[in-house]
Amino acid sequence: MDYYRKHAAVILATLSVFLHILHSFPDGEFTTQDCPECKLKVNKYFSKLGVPIYQCMGCCFSRAYPTPARSRKTMLVPKNITSEATCCVAKAFIRVTLMGNIRLENHTQCYCSTCYHHKI
């Protein structure tokens, strides 16, 4: 019985050290390397058709913070956390038709603005 307690103690100590190391890194440290700023980049897939097609790509900011009590009272479904985010979107674009029937937006300027992931 004493053997199993020592074994369990070693496993718990190892797990504790691993979790401490894991939580000491900022979020996303393992998955992302410096995210580039929001700017125009060539879309390689559509540019193969002969005309260079540009697309806005890159990172903006996002943050989350506790919802103020005053705001929670007015919510239909109260939430403890409020989040904000901006996405890299086109400020200006030119409509382009490729191969007679493919209509695309060729971005000409980019900036960080409100995210509309649901927008088609």
UniProtKB/Swiss-Prot annotation:
Quaternary structure and partners: Heterodimer. The active hormones thyrotropin, lutropin and follitropin are heterodimers composed of CGA, a common alpha chain described here and a unique beta chain which confers their biological specificity to the hormones: TSHB for thyrotropin, LHB for lutropin and FSHB for follitropin.
Superkingdom of the organism of origin: Eukaryota
GO molecular function: follicle-stimulating hormone activity
Cell compartment(s), UniProt: Secreted
Disulfide bridge partners, by residue number: 35-59, 38-88, 56-110, 60-112, 87-115
Name assigned to this protein: Glycoprotein hormones alpha chain
Glycoprotein as UniProt keyword: yes
Glycan-bearing residues: 80, 106
Protein family per UniProt: Belongs to the glycoprotein hormones subunit alpha family.
PANTHER family for the chain: GLYCOPROTEIN HORMONE ALPHA CHAIN (PTHR11509), GLYCOPROTEIN HORMONES ALPHA CHAIN (PTHR11509:SF0)
Protein encoded by which gene: CGA
